[in-house]
């Protein structure tokens, strides 16, 4: 069985006329100085399938209400062929899966177990159209609330979303190297032309703020350092849709969106959720009975 984690890689070409032309190929595990993640139990491994039940790709995501999983728009984009999903919240959800023989992990990944969804929403991601405002946010609505599943005991609370404009003040702040974020996901941990390493296990790492106001971010994305130096880590294929958390809190400020190369080196780019239109869209596409449970807080 071929098993692909999804991440978006942005190829940039600056034309002589000064226009930025964007081309995209699949891009979005934790790399560098990562550690096993037992703290962010609301981060799940998401496998997507087409209408026939054939696996299409995998991502990461955060359960922000009993039935609402926040991920990236390129994960739920209809052009992937995905119409349904299955989510596991074990920290070692995919450990033991053999892609050569198709033998599933003890959790059942990628064929059984977990919780299911037949409702996928894409905020408007369309192959980086409108860049840098790529609308790269998605929702996976569970068929049944998590409270009725085997994972119920993990969810005594849910992560919050950062209120509108929470990151705006950082755009002009000096000493950005001191602003720390936390990433979590189930993606690849090493990619190079020779090999890739995938634990399919929830891992976490710290990242540092690089930029909020250049041509690649411009108020819509946040650029963080993916360099493994100085105790930091980064993200890679399969981490797409996973959370970018403010410092060491459980407040989500962005979702993992894209990188600039296929080897997961350099910088990571996350699509911000601390924007009024995004927050309104999330609430509007969440079950009415759960909207009041989605926390939106100030940093």
Give the positions of each predicted feature.
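Bacterial N-terminal signal peptides that target proteins for export
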Residues: 2-12
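Bacterial N-terminal signal peptides
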Residues: 12-22
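Sec/Tat signal peptide C-region and signal peptidase I cleavage site
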Residues: 25-29
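C-terminal subregion of chymotrypsin/trypsin-like serine protease catalytic domains
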Residues: 36-42, 57-58, 62-108, 199, ...
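Short, hydrophobic/aromatic-rich segments at coil-to-beta transitions
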Residues: 38-46, 179-181
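Short loop/turn motifs at secondary-structure junctions and domain boundaries
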Residues: 51-54, 227-228, 233-237
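Chymotrypsin/trypsin-fold serine protease catalytic domain
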Residues: 133-232, 268-269, 275-280
